[in-house]
Amino acid sequence: ELVWVGQAYNLLLAGGSGTGKTYIAAGLVHEAVKAGYRAYMVTLEDLLTCLKTRDVSRHAMKTYKRIMKAQLLAIDNATLFPLKREDIMLLFKLVNEFQEKTSLIVTANYSLTE
């Protein structure tokens, strides 16, 4: 069941490379769309590019609008590369805008003990 999407709960999928995190996230996004939710999946790198270029790129603005309308956003590969301060601030602002209205799935390449 996808009750958690309607309640704007978040999900962290953490583990080593090749453990199926992206597969699970994509499956949940697919099931959410089938259930009538607006859902979108994006890599962290593509999300940051979109946030940085939405004012100068028509494609980025279209993607940004789709992301902002999503009831579920899956962000893949969140720990694949180090983030700059500017990137962290953009993500913090986005997460704040989503609070209590959009569910997030984040995949991360580390174990919970790290």
Where are these regions (language model features)?
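Pre-Walker A adenine-sensing motif
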Residues: E1-W4
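Walker A/P-loop nucleotide-binding motif
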Residues: A8-I24
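Residue-level preference for the first positions of well-ordered beta-strands
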Residues: N10-L12, L72, S103
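Aromatic/hydrophobic pocket-lining residues that form π-stacking "cages" and hydrophobic walls in ligand
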Residues: A25-L28, L94
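Post-Walker A helix-loop "phosphate-sensing" segment adjacent to the P-loop in P-loop NTPases
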Residues: V29-V42
